[in-house]
Amino acid sequence: VSEEQAKQFAAANIETEDSEKQQKLTAFIRQLNIDEAEKLKGTDFSNAKYPFDTLQAKTTASSQSIRNALTNENRIHSVIYNLPYSVVAGDYSGNISYNNQTGYIFSDDRESSIVINGLKTDSQAIPSIGSATYTGKAFNGTYLNTYDWNSHESKESIKEGLLSYIIDFSKRTGSGEITGLGDTIKLHSGIIQDSNISASAEQGYKTGNYSLGFFGKNAEEVAGKVIFNGKDTVGFGGQRGEIQK
């Protein structure tokens, strides 16, 4: 907190009870960090436009054929997952065949790019004792197709996967999984290096790798991507639960 920010907080809390000041100071500092992270994300990813912990997709052009649970399509689109301290932005373009109920990809000829930005955690600020589970969402650019019996129309929404990732801060390792995008994606154990983890990934018969970074002043978040067949395929992010010591 800068001297100017400290003065701002003091002026706004002259009449605040002493018992409430610490709580308000914590909230004040958190908001300062969120504001700093928003600037680092870039002007395209404002928190007003992209609410926290929500997947948002925008299609520029598409053509598709759907037969029951099978979707074959050519789509140009972006998927954004915004959290307080990080943003995961995926761009996809090209042909793909997938199960529109499970999100499982049968064939993938898309060009893709997944970029992660935000307030990176300083390596010295990552906790050194205990363990914690990070939970959040993931995407692979597939869509869930549903039928509305009231309107008699088919509707689609971006398919959401779920991330669960455990960090053992004492051992400096992390591993986890992503469910809800076809077969479970296993994120095998990797070692914390600086403020990042990189290790192998597996989904059924497919093998690849993943990378993630820590975000927030105190490693409150992780955000990263999974690479299969040499290209960015899955984006993910998660927020930290309580550290168990």
Predicted regions located by residue number:
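Mature soluble binding/inhibitory domains
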Residues: V1-K245
